[in-house]
């Protein structure tokens, strides 16, 4: 966590932390970092996107960058456009799944991959420095390009089966820009599409933009009422996708990710798959069965993308529906992932519930322990020491993860709240609760010891 950048770019409440002035400084800093070039700027449907977009564009052009304004688009549309058109960088104005009073600014490199924490730290240093303006004839220019959505749609259709065989699909677009991509792609694939919340509206009147089960009741009911074959839901900027089975039931995050990993390794052969430290052990089981290898990363799509690039992974994803298909581009792509899942159902000729029934499911329990932010580093150092004294298989890529014969435990400080989170997965509910109680006690003792 930096001064301005969090786990997913610059993000916060508009008018409090995130202001047009800050957006201007961020735009100028990116322009200085790039030293010129051409940058695409996109935005989601939030009501304050226009003000922030104008400020970012002003900052970029004031540092000599040319700007292509691609309008209201999905985050993966921006990533795909930057990579396909050979631009130098991209800027997306979005707060993804956060409520409507939030917004954010996220930078993307020429491959459509999110800026790394190291790059973001450089941007922060530039933001806090004194920048000189260029000569009057060295300012950048702005052009509009409305073709970015078409570029994205066509790129997706190049990757999937286009014989939808009349499948009936319900798509919940969350009043976001996915309405311009996912329904279009699925209809081109030959599917019958029923759209929910498909009118762009930055107030998100249809539902909260985070696609979690409690926000998807309408989607589940509609799937059942229309006898649909699948339900699909995106977040506010469509870098994520989740699914509802033909039975109208929410498809488990980890089980879906495991299913996707298995299919990709079937198609591509044994290879590496990148997932974060919070992903289920069922993914390890499935990947091992296919002769592959799991690479664990910190939580966050930028870390998954970095592992894909560094380790040569054939796929990467997080259980929340953030999936990266490196053969296409390095940005998490909800519409592409949705089309990919529909293509899988077409090829298998079986419903999603039947495919998921083949994937084991293990109980997961979560707990939190209060811990002031200023104590977190020392508490986590002490937690690691205590756990190394008691356990052999320890991973510290993000927090402390303990691997056990019948499960795992992750102790990780929250990036947004004064809490330390404990996540436990085990082969039985009883064992999961037993491990939860044990590790909660360890963490509480460490907090108390540091406070003394």
From Swiss-Prot:
The active site is formed by 96
Give the organism, scientific name: Methanopyrus kandleri (strain AV19 / DSM 6324 / JCM 9639 / NBRC 100938)
Listed NCBIfam families: Arch_GlmM
Entry similarity comment: Belongs to the phosphohexose mutase family.
Cofactor note as given:
Binds 1 Mg(2+) ion per subunit.
Report the EC code(s) recorded for this entry: 5.4.2.10
Name positions with the PTM Phosphoserine.
96
Q: From the UniProt record, which GO molecular function terms apply? A: magnesium ion binding; phosphoglucosamine mutase activity
Name-wise, this protein is Probable phosphoglucosamine mutase
Give the protein's cofactors: Mg(2+)
Which amino acids does the record list as binding Mg(2+)?
96, 235, 237, 239
Q: What does this protein do?
A: Catalyzes the conversion of glucosamine-6-phosphate to glucosamine-1-phosphate.
Q: Which UniProt keywords apply?
A: Isomerase, Magnesium, Metal-binding, Phosphoprotein
Q: Which reaction does it catalyse?
A: alpha-D-glucosamine 1-phosphate = D-glucosamine 6-phosphate
* A single GO BP: carbohydrate metabolic process
* Disulfide cross-links: none
Q: Which domain of life is it from?
A: Archaea
As for PTM, the annotation reads:
Activated by phosphorylation.
Identify one Pfam family in the record: PGM_PMM_II
